Amino acid sequence: VPTPSAARGIIESIYYHPGLKWHIDKIYVMNPIRFTSIRRNEVKNKISANKIMKEANGKGASYIDRKKDIEQRATMMLRNVHYIIEAHFEMTDQANESDNPGKFQDIITRRLRKGQGRYQPYLGTRECTAHFGLWEGGRIPTISETRDLGYMLYDLDFSDPNDIQPMFFRAKLENGVLDLTDCEVVK
């Protein structure tokens, strides 16, 4: 189940404006929670700026040594996920005079119906792209699972830019719904 901040990130990838702030109300889990394991070959080192400068000046060639610079990583990930995110927004003091909730709602609805966003959202890593649309099907058919998911990241507290703090909450899935409307957030 995505964290509330990840769900907000997905929504902001569809529509972001400094004049509004998103709040996640509920996350509906549509498909059973299932895991799969994958292995990936990844480059373990980045090329340094010095190597790039030497190559640009014709004093060397950069390459990746297959034996030294590539490592295999195992990942346990969710598979066949399907969520519905219920959210609302509030206007902020950065909204322009011409901004209003109706205008934002129309833009968001249009983008959701067309599957358009600012950039392609993803779940966890960019290889796990998220596809989205507007739910207009009435009752949401969630899984019938109730499970305590433990403490989960809620968001980051940016109120003090010199001391950004994580905020957590006790995540409880009730009949396939993670309800965030009245959860207790702790630092």
PLM regions: where:
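Long, hydrophobic N-terminal alpha-helical segment
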Residues: 1-44
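Internal, well-folded beta-alpha domain core
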Residues: 42-44, 52-187
